[in-house]
Regions:
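Repeat-blade elements of multi-bladed beta-propeller folds
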Residues: 12-16, 63-92, 106-133, 160-193
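Glycine-rich active-site/cofactor-binding loop and its immediate structural neighborhood
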Residues: 95-97
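A broadly tuned preference for mixed-charge, low-complexity surface segments
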Residues: 31, 130-147, 180-181
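Beta-propeller blade signature
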Residues: 135-136, 140, 190-198
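Aromatic (tryptophan-biased) beta-strands that constitute blades/sheets of beta-rich domains
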Residues: 10-76, 81-83, 91, 101-108, ...
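Short, surface-exposed, charge-dense and proline/glycine-enriched linear segments
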Residues: 44, 55-58, 135-136, 175-180
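Bacterial N-terminal signal peptides
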Residues: 1-5
Length: 198
């Protein structure tokens, strides 16, 4: 379940608010808080649900989960819209911040585990299909996509197919550079991509 209260202190354009991932806003809240609207989004399909049976790289067994990064639908917000990525329906959603009504949805070929980063009218979202998508933040129209690896190889995962190099990080814009990563297993290469966001 995705439940939000309308708190219009300032925009929250990227995962955990800013490029430092501080999770802190300069805005203030007026108490008591009240629920403005809520959206039933179902439960996320986590990438690594539960403890690890064994570590294929080292051979260790009886491990606890160390990758519990997607137990809920995280949100970003900018210019009157609230955004979230969905591992349940492999998409990016944009909602009206005032009413909670869906404004647009964009589907990818695999789960979207973190919210898009909003920068100068563009929503950047990574997907387990191995691509970073650039979407018009107001309309959801596809602008471009960039594969995070040199080839498009897929493997089975959670009753679906994902890239051997999924984009499981929230994109980050620092200055005029867009950063994202593509990686999954320690025995395959990992990629850090720096790109022009425009």
């Amino acid at each position: 379940i995705l439940s939000l209260s309308l708190l219009r202190a300032d925009d929250w354009p990227t995962y955990r608010h800013d490029s430092r991932r501080s999770g802190v806003s300069a805005g203030t809240l007026d108490f008591p808080l009240s629920e403005s609207w809520k959206v039933e989004g179902g439960h996320p399909r986590q990438a690594w649900g539960g403890p690890a049976k064994w570590d294929a790289y080292s051979g260790n067994s009886g491990l606890q989960s160390m990758r519990n990064f997607d137990p809920c639908f995280y949100v970003t917000s900018a210019d009157g819209l609230v955004y979230f990525g969905s591992s349940r329906d492999n998409s990016v959603h944009a909602l009206d911040a005032r009413t909670g009504r869906e404004q647009w949805v964009f589907f990818t070929e695999a789960p979207v585990r973190l919210p898009p980063t909003i920068h100068e009218g563009i929503a950047f979202a990574g997907s387990d299909d191995g691509y970073l998508y650039a979407l018009d933040a107001r309309s959801g129209a596809w602008l471009w996509k960039d594969r995070g690896s040199p080839e498009d190889r897929r493997i089975p995962s959670n009753a679906g197919m994902i890239s051997l190099w999924p984009v499981r990080t929230a994109p980050l814009v620092v200055g005029e550079t867009l950063f994202f990563t593509a990686s999954l297993t320690p025995w395959e290469s990992s990629f850090l991509i720096a790109a022009d966001p425009m």
